[in-house]
Amino acid sequence: MFEFITDEDERGQVGIGTLIVFIAMVLVAAIAAGVLINTAGFLQSKGSATGEEASAQVSNRINIVSAYGNVKTASGTDTVDYANLTVRQAAGADNINLSKSTIQWIGPDTATTLTYDGSTADAENFTTESIKGNNADVLVEQSDRIKIVMDAASITTNGLKAGEEVQLTVTTQYGSKTTYWANVPESLKDKNAVTL
């Protein structure tokens, strides 16, 4: 039933072989565990960074407090030549640098993306002015208010006419988006400015 090995040399070789196989298995298991730990650490840091970016996109937004347009009469037609948005930080937002933001303008006859220009608003750029706070282009405190100025007369053909609307989407440096529909009133007669 049992076979007895009487030769001592054969017994030692079997024991050493088993020991070598065992050590090899332990080494393979240790290497595999190291790879798994490194992979888990990498995935954890990647997931944490992704979570922070997603959180920033959700929380670091602006709120549009109000919007108005300047009315200009040219050739007997009243149009809105400048569209203005008053903005502030959303609750819990970090500093928002409007000079690193973009505004997508989708209007009656034009679709374009506006970028920041510190000196003037034109067909491709918007500018900002401080209403309340120390910065003309960065929202630092919840109480800060900044006016975003867009040259509607340069962006569209002769400005926005009565009854027209434009979709404005402000994208901050964090990637968060705020959309506002600016609706021009049906009548602009005898007005210098109108709520949009």
UniProtKB/Swiss-Prot annotation:
<keyword id="KW-0325">Glycoprotein</keyword>
<dbReference type="GO" id="GO:0005198">
    <property type="term" value="F:structural molecule activity"/>
</dbReference>
<comment type="function">
    <text>Flagellin is the subunit protein which polymerizes to form the filaments of archaeal flagella.</text>
</comment>
<dbReference type="InterPro" id="IPR013373">
    <property type="entry name" value="Flagellin/pilin_N_arc"/>
</dbReference>
<dbReference type="Pfam" id="PF01917">
    <property type="entry name" value="Arch_flagellin"/>
</dbReference>
<comment type="similarity">
    <text>Belongs to the archaeal flagellin family.</text>
</comment>
<dbReference type="GO" id="GO:0097588">
    <property type="term" value="P:archaeal or bacterial-type flagellum-dependent cell motility"/>
</dbReference>
<feature type="propeptide">
    <location>
        <begin position="1"/>
        <end position="12"/>
    </location>
</feature>
<keyword id="KW-0974">Archaeal flagellum</keyword>
<dbReference type="GO" id="GO:0097589">
    <property type="term" value="C:archaeal-type flagellum"/>
</dbReference>
<dbReference type="InterPro" id="IPR002774">
    <property type="entry name" value="Flagellin_arc"/>
</dbReference>
<protein>
    <recommendedName>
        <fullName>Flagellin A1</fullName>
    </recommendedName>
</protein>
